[in-house]
């Protein structure tokens, strides 16, 4: 899909508050990062400033759902509608959150999730990427394993048809990949914890409700305004 192909120097809009992993991959790929300030109430994009920041050079808006709190995706989609702009999601802190009954991480072309040990579920290290774009799916599958073709279908969207020679395809590399495959133990931990995710999020929401009820009238505190249904990665 030519519309999803970026080149060095393309402009990506990001929120001014996030974890470093939101920014550094963009920098490493030579993309131009433009910071937009956050809304002090939601801690996500200040939507008026986001709209003002978009120019004809903008190719991507990267939405970060901070501390479990969804962005207002109705507003973001209205801002980028009819523009050649890709929406991506950093959903590493918001697994299980919803906006208009839709899971965060599924509004953009791709959504990333973290399973670091301090997150909603843990495989100690690791994460998940979701996409409904088959070409991106195949690219990601190859990138996670050195850029090889072993895990691609015979007819694929990255290279020519794979050979029936298993030896050849075992040592054929077509992308500048990484080695980020999970260990079986990590995968097993993740599979079991996903089963518990509804309970985990339910308990976080109960705890957050208690904090809100206890602290909402404190004159020195401003509590993060919930958009949609937060999964409460943290309380701020």
What are these regions (language model features)?
Residues 2-82, 86-91, 98:
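PLP-dependent aminotransferase-like
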Residues 111, 125-126, 231-235:
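Short amphipathic alpha-helical segments
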Residues 48, 52, 60-64, 69, ...:
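PLP-dependent aminotransferase class I/II
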Residues 7, 56, 105-106, 122, ...:
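Structured loop/turn residues at beta-strand edges in well-structured enzyme cores
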Residues 35-37, 113-114, 223-225:
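Structural signal for conserved beta-strand scaffold positions within catalytic alpha/beta enzyme cores
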Residues 89-123, 138, 169-172:
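Conserved active-site segment immediately N-terminal to the catalytic lysine
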Residues 123-127, 190:
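Adenylate-forming
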């Amino acid at each position: 899909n030519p519309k999803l192909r970026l080149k060095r120097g393309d402009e990506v809009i990001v929120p001014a508050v996030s974890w470093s992993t939101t920014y550094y991959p963009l920098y490493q790929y030579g993309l131009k990062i433009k910071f937009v300030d956050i809304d002090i109430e939601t801690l996500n994009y200040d939507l008026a400033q986001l709209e003002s920041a978009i120019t004809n050079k903008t190719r991507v808006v990267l939405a970060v759902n901070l501390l479990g709190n969804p962005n207002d995706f109705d507003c973001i989609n209205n801002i980028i509608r009819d523009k050649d702009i890709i929406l991506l999601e950093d959903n590493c802190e918001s697994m299980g959150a919803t906006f208009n009954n839709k899971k965060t991480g599924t509004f953009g072309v791709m959504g990333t999730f973290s399973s670091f040990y301090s997150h909603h579920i843990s495989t100690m290290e690791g994460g998940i990427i979701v996409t409904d774009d088959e070409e991106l799916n195949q690219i990601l599958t190859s990138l996670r394993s050195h850029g090889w073709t072993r895990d691609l279908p015979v007819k694929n969207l990255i290279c020519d048809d794979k050979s029936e020679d298993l030896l050849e395809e075992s040592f054929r590399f077509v992308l500048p990949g990484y080695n980020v495959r999970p260990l079986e133990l990590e995968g097993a931990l993740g599979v079991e914890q996903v089963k518990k995710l509804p309970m985990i999020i339910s308990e976080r929401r109960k705890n957050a409700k208690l904090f809100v009820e206890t602290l909402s009238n404190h004159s020195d505190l401003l509590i993060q305004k919930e958009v949609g249904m937060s999964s409460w990665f943290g309380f701020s």
